Amino acid sequence: MEENLAYQIDYTANFNKSFRREFQAQKIAECCSPDEFTILYALHFNPNISQSELAKLLFKGKAHVGKMLNKMESRGLIKRVADTRNNIIIKRSIITPKGTNIFKMGHKEFLKIKEKIQENFSKEEMEQFINYLGKFRRIISTIVDVKLK
């Protein structure tokens, strides 16, 4: 198992999920879930991101993400406003001051993780690692086509 690449990637993915839960609980508090924080993160860096794009980012269905957005709005983390995109009426999500405070707190902690990683990996190693992960996904996608929700 130790030398099996697929196992190592799966193990790392599971480790990362556990890490995110613990990181969230210890560093960001219980004000939002890891997925909700990912939504805040995405909205901060891409304010025009659509619900469909959020669903792909989170590997969740559009309806599920819609429920999450509604819950986040009811808790005052975001505000959803009617807007148009390509002549289609959509609900655009805007981070509220409360959501911005949570984002800033989490982002500050995230930067500590990023710094730790950069201390241990060169820029070239990071680029190579990212390329290898992309290559792995492309290879296994030729066996079973994974549809993102």
Please report, for each region that a protein language model flagged, where it lies by residue.
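Charged, amphipathic alpha-helical coiled-coil/dimerization segments
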Residues: 71-131
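Alpha-helical linker/hinge and terminal dimerization helices associated
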Residues: 12-23, 58, 102-118, 136-147
